[in-house]
């Protein structure tokens, strides 16, 4: 496995320079673009990694999975009264579909859906940002995971579209807490800094029927685990989820920080990171690396 990971990074490295680092978040625009890392973690605790897999980066929308899991833990099926679990077919920050569907987001991984999930969690936790940080630390076994306040502040200063979505949902009665307070929590979730190794470990419960090896806790039950993996498979890569399923064939979730997490149910989790994005906002070299890994080992769920 170690040799294979090294080979794959060598093969996809020429793609660096063809994408573009996210620049709509000023604090992310200065990230060094030629970084590339990959980590594979098995449900038995075996770890393999290559490249910049130990270097922390801004996980951004990957955090939406952690938020969803927290909401499922304390509210269960009730969350689906306020949002759906269908692909949107629209940009992740679209307002048009949200208004047409009367303030009920299509799924928890578009921005509006993630904000509803954060609103649900805001009602549950006295300090949502801290609760999220502590939750993630338990999942990955790394007490050094922190939220980057500079990135969070930068995103908060450019919050207009997310605020518009939240207030639109509030006008339809689907947002219960103070919008600014929820946005504060949301951006601190997105600004969490984790490495490929951290994320591969943190997501391994989704490859093991909801059981987290590091904390020894049953994070989700088997049915809930299947549901989260299903939503990742259909909606985890913005409006490129179909292409990712076609090329990689695994449940996944991406973020504009350049990270992608993928789950091989019953076996492994894989995290790749390369900051340069394609036109859909997903890591260009990251998708190519996952495609090669899936092809060579036969990990596709299809």
From Swiss-Prot:
> Which molecular-function annotation in GO is an example for this chain?
glutaminase activity
Gene3D superfamilies registered for this protein in UniProt: DD-peptidase/beta-lactamase superfamily (3.40.710.10)
- Check the record and name the SUPFAM superfamilies matching this protein: beta-lactamase/transpeptidase-like
Identify the EC number(s): 3.5.1.2
Lineage, top-rank taxon, reads Bacteria
Give the residues the record marks as binding substrate. 61, 111, 155, 162, 186, 238, 256
Could you tell me the keywords of this UniProt record? Hydrolase
The EC category is hydrolase
Q: Name one Pfam family in it.
A: Glutaminase
Question: Which Cys residues form disulphide pairs?
Answer: none
Q: Which reaction does it catalyse?
A: L-glutamine + H2O = L-glutamate + NH4(+)
* Protein's GO biological process: glutamate biosynthetic process; glutamine catabolic process
Relate the assembly described in the record: Homotetramer.
Q: Which family does it belong to?
A: Belongs to the glutaminase family.
Q: Which PANTHER family match?
A: GLUTAMINASE
What name has this protein been given in UniProt?
A: Glutaminase
Report the source organism.
Pseudomonas aeruginosa (strain ATCC 15692 / DSM 22644 / CIP 104116 / JCM 14847 / LMG 12228 / 1C / PRS 101 / PAO1)
Task: Tell me the gene name.
Answer: glsA
